């Protein structure tokens, strides 16, 4: 009996953890770290840790509320029907309460412990994802990911504000990189999940305009992304090294975009989706390395 209780508790904890969309949360935190490291000045390590926890909780909050709102369409799609709410492991009410609670806490703690500007930016990012992307855009327009992608681009700007207590065009350069990265990243996934999105009546770009046009736009956004990725060289300490890394990673990104146009198959699209994640980690790791004093 005791063992069963422990298993049930562990299962419940894991399900609430899944509500936070941890894979997205890891990327959010990493890009926030890049914003903090690239910003001029310094911050106490404890405050930096508090800030990152708040950013992670804010991201998780948006993810949980997104799952609460999308529980009807999640039930219709193979990719999402096993999520905690549609599978019945977590009630919709509990998920909403959980998401709202950690979201409010993350913004409140950020405001009290760090500064108001970073707290306001965190709140804007959470609310944008919930109200602009999830509730307004996702089910209404094929531009859902293009516009809604702005919500996922806030973390480096927040990280910058954590250190400087201000916003800067340099922080928004990092924002722009993620903004340009989001469409090719998600469209590569949606090409392989067209039936799911059609069944759930989600007007993804490929569902509305077809796979051929989607692949062309993936290439267009990939080129724009690579060009945008060069901009941090304007303010990073080791600009030549960064440019080399950005061009190297960007050429591979464009190669994948060209490959899916030529091959038009599931495997190439899956490879591009996977690489796009590695690419963003690689690019922001390069930003971090070129912002710190190694010697």
UniProtKB/Swiss-Prot annotation:
One of its GO terms (cellular component) is plasma membrane. The keyword Transmembrane applies. Pathway: Porphyrin-containing compound metabolism; heme O biosynthesis; heme O from protoheme: step 1/1. It is a multi-pass membrane protein. Pfam families: UbiA. One of its GO terms (biological process) is heme O biosynthetic process. PROSITE patterns: UBIA. It is found in: Cell membrane. InterPro entries: Protohaem_IX_farnesylTrfase, UbiA_prenyltransferase, UbiA_prenylTrfase_CS, UbiA_sf. Its EC number is 2.5.1.141. It is an enzyme of class 2 (transferase). Its main location: membrane. GO terms for molecular function: protoheme IX farnesyltransferase activity. Gene3D superfamilies: UbiA prenyltransferase. It comes from the Bacteria. The chain crosses the membrane at residues 24-43, 47-69, 94-114, 117-137, 144-164, 171-191, 216-236, 241-261, 272-292. Keywords: Cell membrane, Heme biosynthesis, Membrane, Transferase, Transmembrane, Transmembrane helix. The keyword Transmembrane helix applies. PANTHER family: 4-HYDROXYBENZOATE SOLANESYLTRANSFERASE, PROTOHEME IX FARNESYLTRANSFERASE, MITOCHONDRIAL. Converts heme B (protoheme IX) to heme O by substitution of the vinyl group on carbon 2 of heme B porphyrin ring with a hydroxyethyl farnesyl side group. Carbon 2 of the heme B porphyrin ring is defined according to the Fischer nomenclature. HAMAP family: CyoE_CtaB. Belongs to the UbiA prenyltransferase family. Protoheme IX farnesyltransferase subfamily. This is Protoheme IX farnesyltransferase. It comes from Wolbachia sp. subsp. Brugia malayi (strain TRS). The gene is ctaB.
């Amino acid at each position: 009996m005791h063992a069963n209780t422990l298993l049930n508790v562990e299962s419940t904890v894991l399900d609430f953890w899944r509500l936070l969309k941890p894979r997205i949360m890891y990327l959010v935190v990493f890009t926030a770290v890049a914003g903090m490291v690239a910003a001029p000045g310094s911050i106490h390590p404890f405050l930096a840790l508090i800030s990152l926890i708040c950013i992670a909780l804010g991201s998780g909050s948006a993810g949980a509320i997104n799952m609460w709102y999308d529980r009807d369409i999640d039930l219709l799609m193979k990719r999402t029907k096993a999520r905690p709410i549609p599978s019945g492991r977590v009630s919709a009410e509990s998920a909403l309460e959980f998401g709202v609670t950690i979201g409010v806490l993350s913004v409140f703690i950020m405001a009290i412990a760090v500064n108001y500007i970073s707290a306001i930016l965190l709140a804007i990012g959470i609310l944008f994802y919930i109200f602009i992307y999830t509730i307004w855009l996702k089910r209404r327009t094929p531009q859902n990911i293009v516009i809604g992608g702005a919500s996922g681009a806030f973390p480096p700007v927040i990280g910058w504000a954590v250190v400087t207590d201000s916003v800067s065009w340099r922080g928004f350069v990092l924002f722009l990189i993620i903004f340009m990265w989001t469409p090719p990243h998600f469209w590569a996934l949606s090409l392989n999940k067209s039936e799911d999105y059609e069944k759930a009546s989600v007007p993804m770009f490929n569902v509305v305009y077809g796979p051929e046009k989607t692949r062309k736009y993936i290439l267009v956004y990939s080129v724009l992304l690579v060009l945008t990725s060069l901009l941090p060289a304007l303010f990073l300490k080791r600009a030549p090294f960064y440019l080399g890394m950005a061009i190297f990673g960007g050429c591979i990104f464009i190669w994948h975009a060209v490959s899916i146009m030529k091959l038009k198959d599931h495997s190439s699209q899956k490879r591009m989706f996977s690489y796009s994640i590695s690419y963003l980690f690689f690019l922001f790791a390069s930003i971090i390395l070129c912002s710190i004093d190694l010697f």
